[in-house]
A protein has these predicted regions:
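Conserved ABC ATPase "signature" region
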Residues: 93-110
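Helical segment within the ABC ATPase nucleotide-binding domain
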Residues: 155-168
Length: 210
């Protein structure tokens, strides 16, 4: 399922994503009667289990590659690091996985030797998606993945994410403040306000009202 989580700035969307990734810092505390992803009870996971799950079973794409990517590492180094953290592969196998991830986001192999500062906004966003996909996650969290892009690139990136979800049978939580945009690309929409869910609808219910 592709689920959209929408709301104005400060409504709690990104904090919800951080909770699902186990990234809520103390004194913050996650409070829920149940919180699970892919059969994992996130309320009881120890740190070691979180490290194994995060970036592997659950992956996240952030909104701005200028801040999310390491500026002093090449694209290859960052993809390779994501793989070696979670999989025991030889160099040839890692190269195959890296090139597969690049093809998935429609980037040429030459990008591997570039640094983030040498990439356009759209290319940087595709690199972040490739890093998220390289370990074949079951769930992808995309936190405002198109907010730093123009309208043409926004649709390209969202169409790319949808295509990868369908090809990989991968679930996606798409976080945005743009309800009309995400409703086109998701099955269901949750609306948040001041940290609470205030509405829920099927995407076709929203589009039929436009």
């Amino acid at each position: 399922e592709r689920l959209a989580l929408v709301g104005e700035s400060g409504s709690g969307k990104s904090m919800t994503a951080r909770a699902l990734m186990g990234l809520v810092r103390k004194p913050g505390k996650v409070s829920a009667s149940e919180l699970s992803v892919s059969g994992h009870d996130l309320l009881t996971l120890e740190n070691k289990a979180w490290r194994a799950l995060r970036g592997n079973g659950i992956a996240m794409v952030l909104q701005d590659p200028r801040y999310a990517l390491n500026p002093v590492q090449t694209v290859f180094a960052q993809l390779d690091e994501a793989l070696t953290l979670h999989q025991r592969l030889n160099r040839k196998q890692r190269l195959e996985k890296i090139n597969e991830a690049l093809r998935a986001v429609e980037l040429e192999p030459a990008v591997l030797q570039r640094y983030p500062g040498e990439l356009s906004g759209g290319m940087g966003q595709r690199v972040m998606i490739a890093i998220a996909l390289v370990n074949d996650p079951q769930v992808l969290i995309a936190d405002e993945p198109t907010s730093a892009l123009d309208a043409r690139l926004r649709n390209q990136i969202l169409e790319l994410l949808v295509a990868q979800c369908e090809q990989r049978q991968m679930a996606m939580l798409l976080i945005s403040h743009d309800l009309p945009l995400v409703a086109q690309h998701c099955h269901r929409v949750l609306v948040m306000y001041q940290g609470q869910k205030v509405d829920e609808m099927r995407s076709e219910e929203h589009t039929s009202e436009l």
